[in-house]
Amino acid sequence: MEWSSESAAVRRHRGTAERREGQAAASHPQREASAQEDARGGGRMRGRTESGGESRGAKTALSEARTALALALYLLALRALVQLSLQRLVLSRTSGLQGEFDARQARVYLEHITAIGPRTTGSAENEILTVQYLLEQITLIEEQSNSLHRISVDVQRPTGSFSIDFLGGFTSYYDNITNVVVKLEPQDGAKYAVLANCHFDSVANSPGASDDAVSCAVMLEVLRVMAASPEPLQHAVVFLFNGAEENVLQASHGFITQHPWASLIRAFINLEAAGVGGKELVFQTGPENPWLVQAYVSAAKHPFASVVAQEVFQSGIIPSDTDFRIYRDFGNIPGIDLAFIENGYIYHTKYDTADRILIDSIQRAGDNILAVLKYLATSDMLASSSEYRHGSMVFFDVLGLLVIAYPSRVGSIINYMVVMAVVLYLGRKLLRPNHSNSNYVRDFLCGLGITFISWFTSLVTVLIIAVFVSLIGQSLSWYNYFYIAVCLYGTATVAKIILIHTLAKRFYYVNASDLYLGELFFDTSLFVHCGFLVALTAQGFCSAFMSAVWVAFPLLTKLCVYKDFKKHGAKGRFIALYLLGMFIPYLYGLYLIWAVFEMFTPILGRSGSEIPPDVVLASILAVCVMILSSYFITFIYLVNSTKKTILTLILVCAVTFLLVCSGAFFPYSSNPDSPKPKRVFLQHVSRTFHNLEGSVVKRDSGIWINGFDYTGMSHVTPHIPEINDTIRAHCEENAPLCGFPWYLPVHFLIRKNWYLPAPEISPRNPAHFRLVSKEKMPWDSIKLTFEATGPSHMSFYVRTHKGSTLSQWSLGNGIPVTSRGGDYFVFYSHGLQASAWQFWIEVQVSEEQPEGMVTVAIAAHYLSGENKRSSQLDALKEKFPDWSFPSAWVSTYSLFVF
């Protein structure tokens, strides 16, 4: 196949010369009229005239090398601007000034909290040491407070239960957990309050600096500054330091449903983390109550917010949740949800330490929280917030400099105005009644088809590569080096898109001028983005503003450079003006794309064994390339050739593919400056299975191993040969959750696990489970009452037999909630001390069941203290390579049939 555009031009030139010999009688005025018609039609005529035959000559075509270099440098320059904005954490420094937030003091709080160590609910570290430290600091703050303010402190120990549809759905029960609550109010009291929420507990085996000790440190310092301020408050500010968020949002539920101060709350700010440091992103607001977004816009000193992030998070794509849900669903209170999102690779690991959080990250978070709380605590809207509960908001920041926000209904009007502008622009071309227009309509429709074909084939191409890489065991090769994904999947997408359009240019649009085709494919890209804009707006997505940006600015650019384009052709001046007009959509597009990959890339390292991460990442990358390349398609039709570009992209992709297949890129890293560990859960388990008569029918013990990513144990086996496929765990078909002690109902995400035989364990505080009573109810159901005692964390599982249904129970709202797979899952936890857990379930039985009506199991999890360790567990943990993070604890599993 010949790739050079000059050769096609030569052939057409030769054909034109032959036709010219047979048309010697043609007059000069006729040729002039033909040239004018050619200009009006964009140089588009199938039967070429003299003027059209030279349209792809060297005079009009752009240089391939220069154009490719210009586009590459343009994108790199925009990426540099994005990176610059992300590295600039604070716009102006106020730390240390009187009445301002002091990040140095907040860091002192942070270091004291993390020095306590991992703080799981129910542990002495969480329930005693951390609580004591918080109360000591609050007392000091109270002593230094201004006489204008009054501080009240309460330590709440709630007990309760609720159901949640997170992770497929389950029920939660908590007993005697801890909340430290502080109310700052005027001396004469206040009728209304704004809530600030953080949690001081952590997951097992992690110091939890970013999640969420730094937020509690920020809140302590905000409390200190506000308490010492001579400025009077109109409303109260309630600071909730909750001690059981990692237990799936239990402490916030205990506060909002049981604490007497909860009735005062009219709005809240929740501080969370999905990464370590960087900027804190506003990723949820509402529901409704646009005045809250306006409060953030007006008050925040270092804004960072996106309605796109809100809609992505609320779609459920990200396997995470925050206390925002509890306050929204159980308190019916609007709020703002903020979270650190950078460097999620070390989130919930041993590397989540205080020294990794930059002082500027603390400063910007403190400045923002202090300013917004002050604004809300002195706002008239807080008292009558229900009057402002209407509609949602479109909001987004501009490189962290400012936030733009407007009501979604206004956004819809703007979006449809942009759509109308496109309709008018394209309508003039598509509906013009002449011969050249009929060709344009046909070419436009074919252009749409070619665009979609290029996207579809490029997506199929990268998916084939991703599936192959996954099948040969080289998944996550890009996890430690993200540029590998760009070189493998990004280049493949770009190459395929360019190839499809080059083939269309050579074999379909044979006699069309370059300028005509450049304009045609700009119009098709504009139309596609306009289609997305209409669809998103019609569905009520606030993130449709992005499509509006990608339609409005390119359209304005086209209208501005059109005359220059027609007069001078595709020259360097045209490229400069065109790229300048695309500056805003491409800059903001790259800004959002950074956020997408910053969030999703680490998540793919902990998304379970069933989702091929390469397939997900390749798809996301392909979509991003399609968006970014959409308005660059024009240049494929304006350059003199694409041969070198395609060959370069194929070469980069092929070399990267070979290196990936050879295993040259290891996914994980123990680099102390930027660790990217593999996550592994180790549980030393003792299992006991009873039959209907209560006899033990099976007993075993071992170390149950779960890898939290798609690679399983393939990278671990060379270091620990005993962990291999011969010890793959087998599902106990008749047991709830396959007969293993799942801490949370994530069994559908992790189906590959290993069970290494090990001696039986005997915790000092063993779990006890018994049937208290069994009674037949008047409505022909059986009520079973149970009692359980054990460690601070337990899980209760239920599976009904054929002919039986679980009709009600004493948990949650009384209606049993099934988990994914049909079993029932109850997550239980208690504080430092708790009475026996007694509850009942009611089973509806259609007929007598010889094998029983229900199978139940209880798992005990020892996450703290001496009981969490065993010599075998410690020995195995030590064998794991330094690029891994094995989180280990002891569990028991006991099954009963009734």
Swiss-Prot record:
Tissue-wise expression: Widely expressed, with highest levels in ovary, kidney, hypothalamus and hippocampus. Within the ovarian follicle, expressed in granulosa cells, but not in oocytes. Present in both preantral and antral follicles, but not in atretic antral follicle.
Gene Ontology MF terms: metal ion binding; metalloexopeptidase activity
InterPro entries named in the record: ERMP1-like_C, ERMP1_1-A_TM, Fxna-like_M28_dom, M28_fam, Peptidase_M28
Cellular localization per UniProt: Endoplasmic reticulum membrane
Cytoplasmic side: 1-66, 415-451, 502-515, 563-573, 637-645
Active site: E245 (proton acceptor)
Site entry: Transition state stabilizer: Y347
Binding site residues for Zn(2+) 1: H199, D211, E272
Glycan attachment residues as annotated in the record: N176, N724
Disulfide bonds: C198-C216
Binding site for Zn(2+) 2: D211, E246, H348
UniProt KW Metal-binding keyword: yes
Primary location group: endoplasmic reticulum
Lumenal topological intervals: 88-393, 473-480, 539-542, 595-615, 667-898
Biological-process GO terms, alphabetical: cellular response to oxidative stress; endoplasmic reticulum unfolded protein response; ovarian follicle development; proteolysis
Stretches that traverse the bilayer: 67-87, 394-414, 452-472, 481-501, 516-538, 543-562, 574-594, 616-636, 646-666
Keyword list, A-Z: Acetylation, Disulfide bond, Endoplasmic reticulum, Glycoprotein, Hydrolase, Membrane, Metal-binding, Metalloprotease, Protease, Transmembrane, Transmembrane helix, Zinc
Required cofactor names: Zn(2+)
Residue ranges of the region described as Disordered: 1-59
Modification sites for N-acetylmethionine: M1
Pfam families noted in UniProt: ERMP1-TM, ERMP1_C, Peptidase_M28
Coiled-coil region list: none
Family classification: Belongs to the peptidase M28 family.
Functional description taken from the UniProt entry: Within the ovary, required for the organization of somatic cells and oocytes into discrete follicular structures.
Stated name of the protein: Endoplasmic reticulum metallopeptidase 1
Organism, as annotated: Rattus norvegicus (Rat)
Source organism phylogeny: Eukaryota, Metazoa, Chordata, Craniata, Vertebrata
